[in-house]
Amino acid sequence: MELHDVRWVVGTCIEDTIPALKREWFGLQKGLHVDSYKAITHVDGFAIHLVPSAMAQVEPSKRDQSGPVDRLWFVNLGGYARNSLQEQHQFGLVVARSQQAAKARAKARWLKASLQVHKDDLHGIDSVGDVDDCLPIDGISGWRISLEFVPNAAETDLTPDWFGYWRIDGRLPRPRPEAVI
């Protein structure tokens, strides 16, 4: 069985992120590979900026005083299709001020034709409603996420920048192979 996981890493190119991906992986290193990746620049009209964590230490206190603020969320929905034995999943990124708002935004966009959109307890995440995972993305190993509203901003869809099978466990093949299109 293959275990899939979404990881958030920072680098000037994908090759720069390999040490972090290997270090953060919780399973066996043998067979560790990348299936796809995507650089995220904009979500829901907000530009995504990375700020060194040391420079962003004032944010939590500012957040407490000003009430809810826009945050970047990763949401994974699950549901069923009448013509399939497997559970259907769709995940993506949204900007919202609360977990409930993030869930509502995701459900309005994804798996509209699925039945019984629901929550799986596979990850042990204390989710809200019918969402598998609804996690705020506040920081990534030494970096904080800063959102800047940009009117008429181009959206970043989740079409991969690259996809295929790229082993990063130290065994061949290396380097990253060309994608099959």
Which sequence ranges carry the predicted segments?
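Intrinsic disorder/low-complexity detector
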Residues: 1, 19, 23, 29-85, ...
